[in-house]
Amino acid sequence: MTYANGASQSDKNGNLLTETDALGNKVQYAYTPEGWLESITRADGTVLTFEYDKTGSLLVQNVGDGQTVESSYNEIGMVTEVSSAEGTIVYQYNGQGYLVSVTNVNGDKVSYTYDAYGNRTSMTYPDGRMVSYTYDAMNRMTSVTGLDGDVTRYTYDAAGRRIETASSTLTTSYRYDSVGNLLTQATSGASEIAFSYSYNKNGYITGEVRTEGGKTTESTYAYDALGQLTSFLQSTGYEEQYAYDKAGNMTEKVLTGTDGIETALKMSYNKGNQLTTMVNGKDKIAYTYDKNGSMVTKVLTSQAYGKLTDAYAYNALDQLTEYVGYDGYQQEFTYDANGMRLSKSEVGNGNRSTLEELLRGNIAGLPEIVELAQSQTNANGADAPTGLEWATTEYLYDLTQEYYQVISETTTSSGGASSTTAYAYGLERIAAFTSDSRTSYVYDGRGSVAQAITMPVAGEAVSSALPDVSVQVQSFSYTAFGEQMGNVKVSGFSYNAEAYDAATGMLNLRARQYEPALNRFSQKDIYPPNLLITYSFNAYLFTFNSPISFVDADGLQASSLSKVLSSIGNTVQKVVGVVGGGIKKVVTAIVGEKVVNTVVSIVKSAAKTVSRVVQNVAIAAASWTSNDPKTIEIIKAAQEEINALDQSDPEYVKKATAIFIAACELAASHVKEQAARQKEHEEFMFNMYGFEKEEVRIMDKIRVGLKAFDPGLTDD
């Protein structure tokens, strides 16, 4: 099948053999006789190879740059160790196959306990501190006891929607319309802030009213027929307007400051949908990419600043490994065998403006430009930062959440000074803890951090009427695509509750880096186009150009905000798989659809133990549902049935397997019923990408087949 932006070839078994993008960059794939992915030859010539045992478990991965990742398994096929040049990660499980501990490459161990239904009941940090959790009869989280002993409680309505979050210092209430859209959200206690929302007939947010400190700010959003955001207007007078080409690339962004002054930015792209220039009058930034589609340079040519260059470097898995700024500011990154960022090292002054900020200049309502000192030059011969200390931050993660989360970060300077921040999570990130303070997070209705409330650990109780003078409240607001507003920008968890780096303007979304000022990712999505999702044909788009009503937590797939909200309270447990992080992205991209088509038959032959069954139930829940409540309910019911079986019964595995297969079939039936709702994508694809009618009909067959898990479906 040929796409508007390139072509791909598959063998008779449906295995992807070659993929060529519109720029002529070709990726090749090879498979073992069993059909397992054996090698990937990337566009830049890098070869990734994979070795398996006789059961198909991945043993050795050559991940490029001369680096390998080796995996070990226990007798029932669950990964116990993953080793790379950075060190070894060790996993331990209980009898039901649930992950009970992870020891990272630095020797830091995180431990977990569970109830009979697989809900995590506690997490113990390396220093011995613990966060504990309770659940109701529907397996919804009802309380979290944090690192300081403070309890956060959750209450739900009859429809399963969260209606209150309450701790000793903050209480947030939620109200919804008849279809589950959030209408109001109000927080009281240590701080007072409220939000209300309005929607169009498609469920997209059209308005937000924020009330804080007696001040009300209204934001309105408009969309085109394809659901792309076309304007963002605040009652402060700040405004952004957007125009797009047929591929969804933003071609113009007009920013109007609160002072009424307009700035028009024009963008151009190559046929691979890569941003090549951003222009403001006579000034411009030129962007270049490597053959794998990752941005490697930005060059600003400006009347005010001359020529300034940023440079980026990546490993063979397209993970950012180095940033060298126009002013000599530098960052370096390392990753573990799971592809998770292990450390960030930086040197130089991080209080700086990005090239995009310098290009557009000061705009009333956005952070002020940090002017360059005369000694600062471009990265081509930049003044190297001499006499400055490097600072290295190491990260520790919780792997049991749907999207792995940082639970601790320790920053150490080359001079030896060190500080640690730990994080506690419930239905979202609750608070950050240092040696002498606690910072609680308050969110807007979209899930972005609206306030960070910091108070001394040993401080007096906070009055809901008049906060103690030692309490510091920091407020955040954002443009539609996620740039921080106000006079200054701050690094930390912010837009969509993800980690923002103010020095580089990047949001770390795990698999890729998102740049709000560009409204897009700086790295190509390695997943092939998904025929169910129109805009996946453009590998750089963020949330289908609808960032107010969609979120992207992993840099791979956007989900509607309503779907994310509807999943609140569900606690499906994910067990660590045999492939992690960056390489998991590569492998899943190739075998994902095939696995979906054959999952039931695979399970029938591969489910040899209850631990494998439980693991597959968890994986199935994560892979099929995209947080669909009905399918999660089916999977949870299967887990309960399996947990209720007598493990000493000789027929135990057979019975557990039968329960799982029945859940597969029931979930598939449910998803098949929803296939008709995807019909609108056919029209979108035809209108936007010019597919012929026969191609559209083939896509429809694939769509229905995928959702029905039809093992016999072929492209012809």
Where are these predicted regions, by residue range?
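Peri-catalytic substrate-binding/gating loops that frame the active-site cleft of hydrolases
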Residues: Y478, K524, P528-P529
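Short, low-complexity export/processing leader segments characterized by acidic and small residues
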Residues: R341-K344, G350, Q451-M455, E483-N487, ...
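Short linker/helix segments within small regulatory modules
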Residues: L532-T534
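A motif-centric feature for acidic-aromatic and gly/ser/thr-rich catalytic loops and repeats
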Residues: N5-A7, R120, A264-K271, T434-A511, ...
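Beta-turn initiation residues at beta-strand->coil junctions
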Residues: M1-N5, T18-G24, S39-G45, V60-G66, ...
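Low-complexity, glycine/serine/proline-rich disordered segments
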Residues: S219, G361-E368, S375-T377, E460-S463, ...
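Aromatic-rich beta-strand edge motifs centered on tyrosine
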Residues: M1-T18, K26-W36, V47-S57, T68-M78, ...
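Conserved short loop/turn motifs at secondary-structure junctions
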Residues: Q331, A497, Y527-N530
